[in-house]
Amino acid sequence: MTTEYETIDTAIPALGEARIPSPLRKEKKQGERFFVSDEKKVLIDSDADRIVEIIRAGKEPSAFEMAGPREMIYFDPSKLRCALVTCGGLCPGLNGIIRAVVLELYYGYGVRNIYGIRYGLQGFIPAYRHNVVDLTPNIVGDIIRKGGSFLGSSRGPQDVNEIVDSLERMNIGMLFMVGGDGTLMAATKIADAILERNLKISVVGIPKTIDNDIYMVSRSFGFDTAVDVSTQSIRAAHNEARGYPNGIGLIKLMGRHSGFIAATAALAQQDVNFVLIPEVDFDMDGHGGFLATLERRLADRGHAVIVVAEGAGQKFFEETGKRDASGNIRLHDIGAFLKDAISKYFSEKKMEISLKLIDPSYNIRSLPANSNDHVFCSFLGRNAVHAAMAGKTKVLVGHWNNQFVHVPMTASAGRRKQVNPYGRLWQSILEATGQGSLRNG
């Protein structure tokens, strides 16, 4: 049986042969053990039975290149000019990525011309008149203490040819793009346009999504911080719910199409009785539906805590077709919908409740990263630099099977990772909450 992993092309494009000895070689005493060969791979599928089956069939298991410094590099650091841009919504850890990239370029490779592009892809377009920032270790030294993005950001597409024109004018040899799925698709188009012009510009993506929904990336930066802070909101909601007869704490968390934050935070703070996510359908009415199940929970225990991802339950709304600046379909407010539906249901039952709705979304997005995410961002940023210095392009640096790897942009862009309703994470939620299917029949 062919798995989805076997069809993934894991080859990483390169601008040319890497012939320059890495300056890291002079600094490190570990010798060759410090460097990573392109032949060093990380298996995509870690299931031993499937690996044996693939090998017996005479095939080679699919694997990603392992990330890390190469002994030979493509670019001459003394003549190199680099650009870095952050795009899309805010996320804890953006400043950590910026800092890690700058420090590795400056101290690791001796690059002195590093430019920060202001306000996302707008910064490349002359009509917006955004200034470029010279990035040095002094400039980025303490930015990890702050939330948001030191360079600013923006949403929405910009003309690819204008972006490449700007890169040519600035004589950029290396572009680091930090962003989510839309940014990675834009990065793919930019890399293609660069190749069509026969330019020697490396494009390296660093995946950013607080929802942790980038395909072929097991963990994205900011997710750990989001879960950490979300558990505080769950704790607050639990205290509110227990403080009143028939108390209900309702927490709306981020997750447009993927419920990883809601599910993981619920498991981290196991006071949650219901978890509603986009990947798992549920009914509102009927004996097996959410409202009747909530009523039974209150009758049994006197309080309840509900966690809902922002993209859950969209079937209960009429489609408007409206989209935001990034092209995403505008979601209806499931938090307000549930609050109204719960209040109406128990009012008709003449059952008094105390309902509190908590939405920490924007607080979470704009916070500084926690310590775990800071470490993760450092690895991502430095490995992105190593990949670019080796002349690799149209690549993103990701985390897979507990290793940092090179993922082709074409393998990830335009696809989404979601919670598997039959997987271990969701089964753990069902065990922890006891909520059942919340479906009739």
Predicted ranges, named:
Residues M1-K26, F75-I125:
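N-terminal phosphate-binding or glycine-rich loops at protein starts, especially the Walker A/P-loop
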Residues M1-R33, K322-G441:
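C-terminal non-catalytic interaction/assembly regions of soluble proteins
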Residues E39-F75, G123-G173, L184, R219-D228, ...:
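Glycine-rich oxoanion-binding loops at beta->alpha junctions
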Residues P77-V85, G123, G141-L151, K208-S218, ...:
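Gly-rich Lys/Arg/Thr-decorated short loops/hinges at beta-loop-alpha junctions or inter-strand turns
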Residues R81-C91, S149-G152, G173-G179, G205, ...:
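Short glycine-rich or small-residue beta-strand-to-loop segments that form or flank ligand, phosphate
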Residues C87-G89, I117-Q122, R155-G156, G180-D181, ...:
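Short, ordered loop/turn segments at secondary-structure junctions
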Residues C91-V101, F124-I125, Q158-I163, D181-K189, ...:
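Short glycine/serine/threonine-rich phosphate/pyrophosphate-binding segments
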Residues S166, M177-G179, L184-K200, V204, ...:
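Accessory alpha-helical/coil subdomains and C-terminal extensions
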